[in-house]
Structures are given as structure tokens and as C-alpha cells.
């Protein structure tokens, strides 16, 4: 009787994610303007429970700016994040327009030291639009007055996103 040994070869899959850090004055005027719009809409976020306000502004290829702020609800998780408010607004009202950039900012009653990243649901929603339009969406994240992080693509924030091919099986 022969004994069989099964060998499993482990393979490593690696994806590198890049965020570039800038100072405000190093950004171009369009990026600075989009960040300001995100701050403006952040101030009207409805966040009475978390006291953590988030604003998102995106710009379409036709130069239309769409804003969104988080909208909380006492019946968690019935609220919606700023990123999805903005991106779904764009999808509903400008379905054939390309989203070029999205700026995301947060205001809290404590000092923010690191970039506030979009939640997984928002990352997946933004990836869906990036894939749908066949063009990268630049993402701009402002941490505080000094530090701003930029990624050329939302996919850098969710390198192993759920793929639509998985639904076809």
C-alpha cells in the first residue's frame, strides 16, 4: 500500500496601495476648490448621535459638483455615509456623466491625526462607479489643515473588492 502525500503550494498575491501626502498649497486649484466644497457640506451633516460629521464633494466630467454629507438615524444602521449620499446623487441625477474626483473631509469634536478612510460599504460603492464608467476616480482625503492624502484611484483603498464576475457563476 502506498501512502500519498499531498503538497499544497502556497502562493502570495500582493497589491500595493499608494496614497500621496500633500500640503494644501501643493494641490491644484480644482482639488483645493473641491476640498472647500466638502468642508462646506460637512458643516450641515446630520450627526446628532456620533457628533462625527463627514462631507464629500465630487466633480463630474461636465464640471458639475455634487455634494453629500452623512445623515444619521437613531435606528442604526438606517443612516447613510456622505460618500454614498454624493455618489448615489450623481448616479441618479447625472447617470451618464463620469465622476473624476471625490474629496472627503471629517469634522469631529476631537483632533484628527490620520486620514479618515471611507467605510467598506462606501469603498465598494465607489469602486462600482469606477468600474461602471471605465475610468479611475481620484480620491482626496483631508486629515487636518496640514495633511491631505490623494490616491489616483478608489481601488487603492479596496484592492480586493467584490467583483461582479462572482455573481455570474
Regions found by a protein language model. Give the residues of each.
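A short glycine/serine-rich beta->alpha loop
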Residues: 69-76, 108-113
